[in-house]
UniProtKB/Swiss-Prot annotation:
This is Phosphoribosylaminoimidazole-succinocarboxamide synthase. It catalyses: 5-amino-1-(5-phospho-D-ribosyl)imidazole-4-carboxylate + L-aspartate + ATP = (2S)-2-[5-amino-1-(5-phospho-beta-D-ribosyl)imidazole-4-carboxamido]succinate + ADP + phosphate + 2 H(+). Its EC number is 6.3.2.6. InterPro entries: SAICAR_synt/ADE2_N, SAICAR_synt_PurC, SAICAR_synth, SAICAR_synthetase, SAICAR_synthetase_CS. CDD domains: SAICAR_synt_PurC (cd01415). Pathway: Purine metabolism; IMP biosynthesis via de novo pathway; 5-amino-1-(5-phospho-D-ribosyl)imidazole-4-carboxamide from 5-amino-1-(5-phospho-D-ribosyl)imidazole-4-carboxylate: step 1/2. The gene is purC. NCBIfam families: purC. One of its GO terms (cellular component) is cytosol. One of its GO terms (molecular function) is ATP binding.
Length: 237
């Protein structure tokens, strides 16, 4: 597989074309940002940690019947992925109240949400990823009703798989965001799953073990990401 020109560079990942028009190389960089890019930093080993973390999670989800774009690791910081037509709507499931939910509704952090909540957000940094609903998504042509239903179904299936995985390792999966795309008429999980895009707490101490460590200046960001990975059985070296 020959890696060719860069197609897109996001805040923490880059996408490269390959000699196969249906395959891309996803490169995880050491760049870290928060608050729509207002806070930025380079964190050593982050690209490697998130790449291997994502590979582990994607393989678990594939084994559970969730279709993903992940095809395999190419190097410490690179993965081979299927080309998707991405849907510009993020799916968010919350098992515990935290983050924007608390700010928006004035609820305290740490409340168990039963059943877990499901929300949609438009992927748009300039607008700060506003919350939207199925009606808006269909009316503006971001996704069809049946696609949104499938995205919701898969997002909850991911929760069933990963909530138990983290719980068995002594951690709470507080919330997470997923992005989906289209491939051959199928809805497929794209982007990544890493501590950058979810909230993870220690089950006993409620220690934050995700990107909130960077957002809130708690320190030991990558060391904590690696601790999460080790608890799950991920080998980084």
């Amino acid at each position: 597989m020959e890696k060719r020109e860069e197609l897109y560079a996001g805040k923490a990942k880059s996408v490269y074309r390959t000699d196969d028009p249906e395959r891309f190389v996803l490169v995880f960089r050491d760049d870290t940002s928060a608050f729509d890019g207002e806070k930025k930093e380079q964190l050593n080993r982050k690209g490697m940690v998130n790449n291997k973390f994502n590979a582990f999670i994607m393989e678990k989800l594939e084994a559970a019947g969730v279709p993903t774009h992940f095809e395999g690791l190419l190097s410490d910081t690179e993965s081979l992925v299927k080309k998707l037509e991405m849907i510009p709507v993020e799916c968010v499931v919350r098992n515990v109240s935290a983050g924007s939910l608390c700010r928006r509704l004035g609820v305290e952090e740490g409340l168990e949400l039963n059943p877990p909540t499901f929300e949609l957000f438009l992927k748009n940094d300039a607008l700060h990823d506003p919350m939207v609903n199925e009606s808006l998504a269909v009316s503006f042509g971001w996704a069809k009703a049946d696609e949104l239903a499938r995205m919701k179904e898969l997002t909850y299936k991911v929760n069933d798989v990963l909530k138990k995985l983290f719980d068995d390792a002594g951690m709470l999966l507080v919330d997470y965001k997923l992005e989906f795309g289209r491939s051959g008429g199928q809805i497929v999980l794209g982007d990544e799953f890493s501590p950058d895009g979810c909230r993870i707490w220690d089950k006993e101490t409620r220690k934050k073990m995700d990107k909130d460590r960077f957002r809130q200046g708690l320190g030991e960001v990558i060391e904590t990401y690696e601790e999460v990975g080790r608890r799950l059985g991920i080998k980084f070296d």
